[in-house]
């Protein structure tokens, strides 16, 4: 079984608004996952005050975790299943791109700019993870999933300009 963990705890300072709520955000990803099949879905919400923003199973970040890499470690320790991490700002992600990640064990997605997206990954073998505070190093042992049909779905959005470009397409 695979547990899908939606990452929705960021401050979205560069975007200027809460990325978890833009264009359906977390709710849209939950719907995509449910269209594919029956999966446990957990939304990591960041601060406890953000819990009411989301439906379903919602976990606040533990206080003892000082960075996202440590939050990822904490989640991995708590979940025995395979884990598919999905950032809430994957606004192009569709069913076919998500399905491709579900069926590919131990992979990190690569976006249309050929950049690895370590937070969009499928973990089946936890022994491949490295102990590191940097995400790129933590997932360095995971092969890239370079599926040309879906690279445009594997891009995240960090700036308002990214979102404007997306909306104008």
Could you tell me what each predicted segment is?
Residues 1-115, 130-135, 141-153, 161-163:
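Nucleotide and nucleotide-moiety/phosphate-recognizing core
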Residues 117-123, 156:
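Short glycine- and hydrophobic/aromatic-rich loop-to-beta-strand nucleating segment
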Residues 123-135, 167-169:
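Aromatic-glycine-rich donor-binding/catalytic loop that engages nucleotide-sugar donors
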Residues 158-169:
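Short amphipathic alpha-helical segments
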């Amino acid at each position: 079984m695979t547990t899908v963990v939606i990452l929705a705890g960021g401050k979205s300072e560069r975007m200027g608004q809460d990325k978890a709520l833009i264009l359906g955000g977390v709710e849209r990803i939950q719907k995509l996952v449910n269209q594919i099949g029956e999966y446990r879905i957990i939304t990591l919400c960041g601060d406890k005050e953000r819990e009411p923003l989301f439906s379903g199973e919602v976990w606040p970040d533990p206080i003892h975790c000082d960075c996202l890499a440590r939050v990822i470690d904490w989640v991995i320790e708590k979940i025995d299943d395979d884990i598919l991490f999905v950032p809430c700002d994957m606004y192009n992600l569709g069913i076919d791109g998500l399905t491709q990640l579900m069926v590919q064990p131990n992979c990190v997605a690569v976006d249309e700019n050929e950049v690895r997206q370590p937070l969009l990954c499928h973990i089946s073998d936890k022994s491949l993870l490295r102990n590191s505070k940097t995400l790129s190093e933590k997932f360095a042992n995971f092969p890239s999933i370079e599926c040309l049909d879906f690279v445009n779905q594997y891009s995240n959005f960090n700036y308002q300009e990214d979102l404007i470009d997306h909306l104008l397409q």
